[in-house]
């Protein structure tokens, strides 16, 4: 500012620099200051710092003041400052800033509002410089909580770390708190760093600076069917006053508290649901807890309903809730003692077994192990099972009666070779080797007795390896194997030509049956032929006492075919082709069956080894194996067939032509006869037609006249009927109209009469009401009163006129002239007497 005269208003100030001494001083208004030549005004007058109520400001590098509050000056006259320090100033008179002082501005504002601490809130503050407050000294680093509601008065030695909100603790909840340092809490309980505890007091809880809130713990509602399993993190005494060891588990139930809040050193393991048992249920508890609270590992406890309980820690129910075993009349339980105990009056040793037969309800005891629930096995007369005695090892079969296993008996499984199992499931007990299933799995119940249906005219050999002897069963029959018996499996040749082991079978068909085979033979002139032979066979056995020789030859088909083929080859080798071709059947039959002493061919071929008999042999085909020979033979045969066929065709053609000529002659003769009959019939028809035309001509005119007369009669009759109908309709219409008019007039007359009656009744009622009204008025007013009213008018008029001095009066509008001559007397009325 360059003006020499400076006008400083009230509550304004300037800084004047003395250029000679380089000292700056402050001048406050109101004043008019004349600046000297060696002085410089550093800035225009500016307002003083004003701090309103409930506000404060921070001044940096404040000036030093004396005990009386005056500003302390240095020897040079400069204001002495506390450099690097700050000063908080509250409401008061506006003050100037001395040279060197600065106003600390936050967010562009130098004056700040005092902070209000609301309820359930606190300020976490920290001392950054030692200071003395009243009678105590506060060291740097000290922290404390300023709780609301109040106004926070700031200090330069104290900084606000954070604003802390109180945590509300609701019913059935608690606050988990941890100590940061060693201290004594507000309840007077000493705490060490890292210690945790629960604050259970309801309401708002404002933590101290030595505490850390870890969270709000929600309580668990307990009931008769719900408990809480807990585990101790460290050794401590719980809220119920019980000492707990680290790692220990226990349960809290409704008997302890309706609501449990997990403590700081407790861990929730699980919610435990109650086990409810009905009268028909029980459970087996493993590792039960004794009266001291310890588990008896390895032991079991049986509980039967009706009851409700909780499983204690360490207890398990591997099998869950089980139904009481209801043992029926045809059932039993196999039991085994696991330890020595007394069952009623009987002493049971460990390992001893016994059976309990129904009907009853059974619950296993701790000392007893349930081995098996057995039932009576119902068996038909053709059903059975294998049973083994576990004491002696004897195996037997039970057939055709219901059976219950005894204590020392078990079902014995009879295993058969896989090939036999597959044959048992085949339809007829036989199967082709090429059709065997490599992945076959038997579905037979092994303890069921092995059964096989022997077909009609078949036999099965069963071998008992314990007795070392077989038995033969003839069909139709049902075979049941004893425990030590096995089937004899037949392996037969099959196919054409025969291949060994092509067919496996459990039963031997006794025949009569047939078999076919193909063999190659060579004649004496070296012609090779392929023969297809079929032969019938059967087994000649005694059904009352079948012989074992029947099954002595395992492959009787292959043996028979080989024997027959050998005989046929030998016989054909002695014949040339032409001779064999002409007499093949006879040569083969003679070779196979042989001849008797008389030289005749025998009827059959018998194999004495197994009583196998071949009764007939048939040559189905015979053809050379060489292709050229076969073709030439076929051509010669075809040529012979053609010659025979043509001769037969010629004979047939001649016979047909002869029959055709005879048929044509008969046909022509029949045609002539038919024409004669037709002409005769035509003549008769013409005669009848002439007669018909004559009758028709005479009767047509008569019919027409009759028809016209009949039509005229019908027309006249219909017109008469129509006239009658029209007259009847007109009469009905007139009568209806007359009746309608009469009804209308009657209704109108009735309406008029009723209307008149209503009017008369209304008039009569009105007159009566008026008369009654007048009568009642007269009665109410009275006769004397009426007389007085009647006289009151004239008397009043007379008095009015007398008072006015008038004899009469007339009222008019002035527009209508009135002739008053002779009318005055009438208008005034009678004179007063």
From Swiss-Prot:
Coiled coil: none annotated. InterPro entries: Band_7/SPFH_dom_sf, MVP, MVP_rep_dom, MVP_rep_sf, MVP_shoulder, Vault_2, Vault_2_sf, Vault_3. It is found in: Cytoplasm; Nucleus. MVP repeats lie at residues 54-118, 119-170, 171-223, 224-278, 280-328, 329-380, 381-433. Pfam families: MVP_shoulder, Vault, Vault_2, Vault_3, Vault_4. Keywords: Cytoplasm, Nucleus, Phosphoprotein, Repeat, Ribonucleoprotein. The keyword Ribosomal protein does not apply. The keyword Repeat applies. One of its GO terms (cellular component) is ribonucleoprotein complex. Required for normal vault structure. Vaults are multi-subunit structures that may act as scaffolds for proteins involved in signal transduction. Vaults may also play a role in nucleo-cytoplasmic transport. PANTHER family: MAJOR VAULT PROTEIN. The vault ribonucleoprotein particle is a huge (400 A x 670 A) cage structure of 12.9 MDa. It consists of a dimer of half-vaults, with each half-vault comprising 39 identical major vault protein (MVP) chains, PARP4 and one or more vault RNAs (vRNAs). This is Major vault protein.
